[in-house]
């Protein structure tokens, strides 16, 4: 009897261990991929590759998707050309192009900060360069004392006041982060603007790699999961500026928070955004 109990206990323990191992999901692996790269950058390439292989074994479609996303993440932080003040020549000159202007936190009273106006000035120049492109202004309510005022609507009003034709304007005014900008913008473009095949990002110079990453990753993920048409980030135009809150040596941290938010790991994303010193980093 005693030996039978021991055997039964061993079997139950093995089942518990197996159950715990089986509980690891594809989303868990993707979270690890993001965190390893976000914490260690290229030093974690070997570990990230192992995780991508693990993900592919679990889900071939998502494995291929995330390999492409990680290649793009490396690209934006090393080789992405950032074009100041205007878009490059040679982009599509028809309505397949959408110029996406990323919002920036409003003043407490709802007025726009100088940095946001700078982005809009660049966007207006881009709209004149490509007169057949639509212009999407994206950003939600970030004014502490005027929550009814949104970045997207304020930006759109500014563009109209400075000569943009109303039929070219698209407003997305529910997003509070760059990750939400990307996801909400795709929904609008996919459902209401079937001619759009590519986007050009307009933002501050330090934010272009970050914004391009989250938009391309968000667009890729949305199209892959829905089995719908792909929209690509093909270029950018930057308002040249710096920002003490978003220092160059910390941009990987903010990118990581955005990527985690994009996959629905909001609590972990908030740690990277606002409590980075206490983030429990994975061991390399």
Q: For the regions a protein language model found, what residue spans apply to each?
A:
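Short, solvent-exposed amphipathic alpha-helices that sit
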Residues: 119-123, 147-159, 210-221
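N-terminal nucleotide-binding beta1-loop-alpha1 segment
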Residues: 97-105
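Histidine-anchored nucleotide/phosphate-binding helix
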Residues: 113-131
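Bacterial N-terminal signal peptides
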Residues: 9-16
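Bacterial N-terminal signal peptides that target proteins for export
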Residues: 1-8
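Surface-exposed cleft-lining segments at the edges of enzyme active sites
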Residues: 105-112, 144, 171
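A non-catalytic structural micro-motif
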Residues: 134-136, 156-174, 220-240
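Extended hydrophobic blocks
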Residues: 20-98, 183-284
């Amino acid at each position: 009897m005693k030996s039978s109990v021991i055997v039964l206990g061993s079997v139950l323990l093995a089942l518990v261990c197996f159950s715990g191992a089986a509980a690891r999901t594809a989303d868990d692996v993707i979270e690890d991929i993001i965190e390893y790269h976000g914490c260690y950058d290229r030093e974690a390439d070997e570990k990230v590759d192992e995780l991508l292989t693990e993900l592919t074994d679990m889900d071939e479609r998502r494995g291929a998707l995330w390999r492409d996303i990680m290649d793009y993440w490396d690209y934006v932080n090393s080789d992405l050309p950032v074009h100041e003040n205007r878009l490059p020549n040679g982009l599509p000159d028809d309505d397949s192009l959408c110029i996406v202007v990323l919002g920036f936190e409003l003043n407490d009273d709802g007025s726009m900060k100088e940095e946001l106006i700078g982005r809009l000035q660049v966007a207006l120049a881009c709209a004149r360069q490509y007169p057949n492109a639509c212009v999407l202004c994206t950003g939600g309510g970030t004014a502490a004392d005027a929550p009814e005022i949104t970045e997207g609507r304020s930006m759109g009003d500014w563009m109209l006041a400075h000569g943009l034709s109303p039929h070219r304007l698209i407003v997305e005014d529910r997003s509070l982060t760059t990750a939400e900008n990307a996801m909400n913008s795709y929904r609008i473009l996919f459902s209401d603007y079937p001619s759009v095949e590519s986007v050009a990002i307009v933002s501050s110079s330090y934010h272009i790699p970050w914004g391009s990453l989250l938009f391309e990753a968000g667009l890729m993920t949305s199209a892959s999961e829905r089995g719908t048409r792909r929209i690509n980030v093909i270029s950018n135009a930057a308002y040249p500026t710096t920002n003490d809150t978003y220092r160059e040596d910390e941009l990987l941290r903010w990118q990581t928070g955005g990527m985690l938010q994009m996959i629905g790991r909001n609590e972990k994303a908030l740690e990277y955004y606002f409590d980075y010193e206490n983030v429990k980093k994975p061991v390399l």
